C-alpha cells in the first residue's frame, strides 16, 4: 500500500464488560420507565388528538370548482363556502379540550423517546465500538424536532380552526396553513427522518450484537419506517408495542427468562443466522434419529450350539 494513502484505523476494542454492566444496571430502570411512558403517551395522545374528529364528512354537494368561482366573481356574486370551508366549520364544532391534550401528549412522547434511544445506543456501542455516533445525534435531533413539530403544527392548526369565522375555501385554507403550521410541519418532517434513521440503525446493530432478538430488531426497523411513512401506523400502535416490550427487556424481565444473553455477559453475542439455526436444528434432529449401536450376535457353530454352550460341554467332559 502506498504511504501517501491514509491508513485505515482499526476499530477500538469493546468496552470492559464489567464497566458496561455497571452503567446499565444504574440506568436500566430509568430507560424502562421512559419506554413505558413513551408507549402510553403515544397511544393515548393519538386517540385523544383525533377524538370526535376522525370522521370528517366529505360534503360532496358543496364542491366549488375554479370555473364556478370565476363565474361568481364575474357576476358580482359571493363565492359559496365550498367543501373545505364546510369541513373546517364541522371540525370547529367538534373540537374539544381532549384534542389539545392529545397533541401535547404526542409531542411529549417523542421527547421521552430519546431516553430509550440513548440507553440502547450506549449498550450497543459498548459491545460494538464501531457503531457510529451519528445514530445518537439523529435520534436526539429527531426526538426534539418531531416532538416540537407535532405540537406546533397541530396546536396552531386547531387554533386556526377555532378562530375561523366563516368564508370560502381560500379563507379556510389560510386558517389551516398559517405560518406556524408550515414551520411545525417542516420540523415534523425533519424529525420523522431523524427518528426513522435512528430506529433502523439501532434495530440492526442491537440485533447484531445480540441485545435484541431478530423479532425485536426487525420490528424496530419497521417502526423506523413508520416515522417516514406514517400511513403504515397512523395511531402509533406498532411503536407503542415495541416500546412496551423493550421496557421489560431493559429490566431483564420476560416470561421464561428468555432475555438475550448479551445483556447478561456485557459482550457481543450475535444471534445465529437463519442458515446456522436450521443447520443446528437439523444436526440435533439427526442425532435423535440415529439408532443406538446394536450388540454383536453370539458366535454359533455348525451344530447350532453357541460358544458358551460348547465351553460348558468341555467342562463336563473333564
PLM feature spans:
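Hydrophobic, aromatic-enriched alpha-helical segments typical of multi-pass transmembrane helices
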Residues: 2-318
Amino acid at each position: 500500500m502506498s504511504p501517501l494513502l491514509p491508513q485505515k484505523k482499526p476499530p477500538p476494542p469493546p468496552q470492559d464488560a464489567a464497566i458496561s454492566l455497571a452503567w446499565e444496571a444504574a440506568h436500566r430502570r430509568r430507560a424502562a420507565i421512559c419506554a413505558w411512558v413513551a408507549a402510553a403517551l403515544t397511544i393515548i395522545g393519538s386517540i385523544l388528538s383525533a377524538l370526535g374528529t376522525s370522521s370528517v364528512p366529505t360534503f360532496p354537494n358543496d364542491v366549488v370548482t375554479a370555473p364556478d368561482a370565476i363565474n361568481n366573481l364575474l357576476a358580482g356574486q359571493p363565492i359559496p363556502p365550498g367543501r373545505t370551508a364546510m369541513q373546517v366549520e364541522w371540525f370547529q364544532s367538534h373540537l374539544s379540550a381532549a384534542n389539545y391534550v392529545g397533541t401535547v401528549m404526542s409531542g411529549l412522547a417523542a421527547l421521552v423517546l430519546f431516553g430509550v434511544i440513548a440507553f440502547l445506543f450506549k449498550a450497543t456501542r459498548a459491545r460494538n465500538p464501531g457503531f457510529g455516533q451519528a445514530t445518537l445525534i439523529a435520534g436526539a435531533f429527531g426526538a426534539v424536532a418531531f416532538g416540537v413539530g407535532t405540537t406546533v403544527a397541530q396546536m396552531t392548526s386547531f387554533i386556526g380552526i377555532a378562530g375561523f369565522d366563516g368564508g370560502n375555501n381560500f379563507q379556510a385554507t389560510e386558517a389551516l396553513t398559517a405560518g406556524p403550521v408550515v414551520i411545525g410541519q417542516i420540523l415534523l418532517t425533519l424529525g420523522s427522518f431523524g427518528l426513522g434513521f435512528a430506529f433502523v440503525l439501532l434495530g440492526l446493530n442491537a440485533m447484531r450484537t445480540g441485545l435484541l432478538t431478530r423479532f425485536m430488531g426487525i420490528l424496530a426497523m419497521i417502526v423506523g419506517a413508520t416515522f417516514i411513512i406514517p400511513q403504515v401506523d397512523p395511531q402509533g400502535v406498532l411503536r407503542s408495542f415495541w416500546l412496551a416490550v423493550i421496557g421489560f427487556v431493559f429490566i431483564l424481565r420476560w416470561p421464561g427468562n428468555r432475555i438475550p444473553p448479551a445483556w447478561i455477559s456485557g459482550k457481543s453475542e450475535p444471534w445465529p443466522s437463519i442458515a446456522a439455526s436450521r443447520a443446528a436444528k437439523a444436526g440435533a434432529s439427526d442425532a435423535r434419529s440415529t439408532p443406538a449401536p446394536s450388540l454383536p450376535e453370539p458366535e454359533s457353530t455348525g451344530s447350532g450350539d453357541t460358544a458358551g454352550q460348547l465351553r460348558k460341554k468341555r467342562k463336563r467332559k473333564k
